[in-house]
Design a protein with these regions (language model features):
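A conserved beta-strand-loop-helix scaffold within acyl/acetyltransferase catalytic domains
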Residues: 3-49, 53-66, 115, 141-156, ...
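C-terminal catalytic domain of photolyase/cryptochrome flavoproteins
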Residues: 31, 42, 310-311, 371-434
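Intrinsically disordered, low-complexity, positively biased terminal segments
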Residues: 47, 66-67, 77-119, 125-128, ...
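Acyl-donor binding region in acyl/amide transferases
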Residues: 67-152, 319-321, 325-392
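Juxtamembrane/interface motifs at transmembrane-helix termini
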Residues: 74, 224-226, 354, 419-420
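Secondary-structure boundary/capping residues
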Residues: 103, 239, 364, 397-398
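Acidic carboxylate-rich catalytic motifs and surrounding loops in phosphoryl-/glycosyl-chemistry enzymes
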Residues: 110-111, 147-150, 197-200, 371, ...
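A short, hydrophobic/aromatic-rich structural module that often spans a beta strand
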Residues: 121-132, 155-171, 409-434
């Protein structure tokens, strides 16, 4: 077997049939990374029958001063990691290729599950696992960065997904917590809908992300990042951005209708009881009346609040948005956020539900909420994020982690010293600005 360079078409033909394919291993993703001076390499391992049995899209970037290259195969390689002989052959051939290209190491973070977990994060007894894949990589000299509970260097190691292949939307909804279904119905009554934005509306999404990053204290990307993503991923159907909007006129109309229906129900009950038509004991009769009266008062206050909201925001207002990537086996939620000013409407439920619908209707294998942590203790500051995703049903996914295949130990160690020093200085500079 030998490693060969593939043209983009041949690589796509191989990659799209591979069970581990993600948007990371596409020409479109490579083109996006070109903006930051990454160069794409498409390679495949060819057997004696001229068949490609393993492959990868690998990115390289020339390091300053030393003029050596670092390599990264995002969510690669596309190979059966449990086949040690195949992995060994591919590794040895790739080493030669990377060395020839002046590379000092190649980083991988395969889209391969380590072991099966349920919705609570528990390991499933007698469930599937790929522990041999980890052992094979370590035996072949790959530097393993450990079973991190948080995010790896570049990509999440823990995710939450809903299986959607050959399932109806009703099937999926049955697995959701009752509270989640209630919120979805409530949002519909409130006039919350979603729509896909255009490129010209990217500043709207950027504004959502800025408010979210300020609130949650993470660094957001510039508008140019989202523009580059759009330009490289949208036309091929990979990228879709949905925003949630509330229509206060619909919210008002539905509230008025609910109030009128409740008033009608109350009047009919009293009339039927007075005429002896309704057979109901006094305790139940009074309890039902009290409940309706409280509902009417609540709806009256709600109508007053809606008038205030209309005065402040107009007829409609944007609540939040999510950037979805749709490719291969799944619909994935990559970036998302919401405005704090109207958080009470919980628009994230509605937008994620639209993502679930896309996965079901497109018969994808799954809907991927993407990153969570592997720390399922209530004390974990990010536990609430996990609970939110868990409420939709599904299960936890743990990947096999991150690895470096070192080609030159000297230059690899030099790079890491320089890299760590750079980030220390950057953090000091950042802290001085505060």
């Amino acid at each position: 077997m030998k490693l060969i360079k593939l043209n983009k078409k041949d690589f796509k033909n191989f990659a799209d049939k591979h069970p581990q394919i993600t948007f990371h291993q596409t020409e479109e993703w490579a083109n996006l990374k070109k903006v930051n001076n990454w160069q794409a390499h498409y390679v495949g391992l060819e057997n004696d029958n001229d068949e490609i049995v393993a492959g990868a899209m690998i990115l390289s970037k020339t390091l300053p001063i030393i003029k050596k290259k670092m390599f990264y195969s995002p969510r690669g390689f596309l190979i059966n990691y449990n086949d040690k002989k195949l992995l060994e052959t591919f590794t040895n051939e790739l080493k030669k290729y990377i060395k020839k290209e002046q590379g000092i190491f190649v980083k991988i973070d395969p889209f391969v599950e380590y072991q099966e977990h349920d919705n609570d994060g528990n390991i499933v007894k007698d469930g599937y696992n790929n522990k041999s894949a980890v052992e094979n990589l370590k035996k072949l000299g790959y530097k393993f960065f450990g079973f991190n509970l948080m995010q790896d260097t570049l990509q999440p190691r823990w995710m939450h997904v809903i299986e959607t292949k050959n399932r109806t939307l009703d099937d999926v909804m049955k697995d959701m917590e009752s509270k989640t279904r209630q919120i979805l119905r409530k949002n519909e009554r409130c006039g919350i809908t979603t729509r896909e934005i255009t490129r010209d509306e990217l500043p709207i999404f950027k504004d959502i992300m800025k408010h979210t990053s300020d609130r949650r204290e993470f660094v957001d990307r510039p508008l140019s990042y989202y523009e580059a993503m759009w330009d490289n991923l949208h036309d091929s159907g990979i990228l879709k951005i949905l925003i949630a909007e509330i229509d206060f006129n619909i919210y008002e109309k539905n509230t008025i209708e609910e109030k009128e229906e409740t008033e009608k129900s109350l009047k009919e009950r009293i009339y039927k009881k007075d005429k002896g038509i309704l057979k109901m004991n006094e305790k139940k009769f009074n309890s039902s009346n009290k409940q309706d009266e409280e509902t009417i008062k609540r709806l009256e206050k709600q109508l007053e609040k809606i008038k205030e909201l209309k005065k402040e925001y107009g007829d409609k207002e944007i609540l939040g948005g999510i950037l979805f990537l749709i490719y291969g086996n799944e619909v994935l939620s990559l970036h998302g956020g919401s405005h704090a000013k109207l958080m009470q409407f919980q628009s994230a439920y509605t937008i994620h539900f639209e993502g679930v619908k896309m996965a079901v209707e497109g018969n994808y294998n799954r809907y991927n909420f993407y990153g969570i942590t592997g720390d399922f203790r209530k004390e974990n500051p990010l536990y609430g994020l996990y609970l939110f995703k868990k409420s939709f049903g599904g299960h936890v996914v743990e990947l096999i982690g991150e690895y470096d295949l070192i080609i030159s130990k000297f230059w690899y160690n030099t790079y890491n010293i320089a890299f760590n020093l750079y980030h220390k200085l950057k953090n000091i500079k950042s802290s001085l600005k505060k």
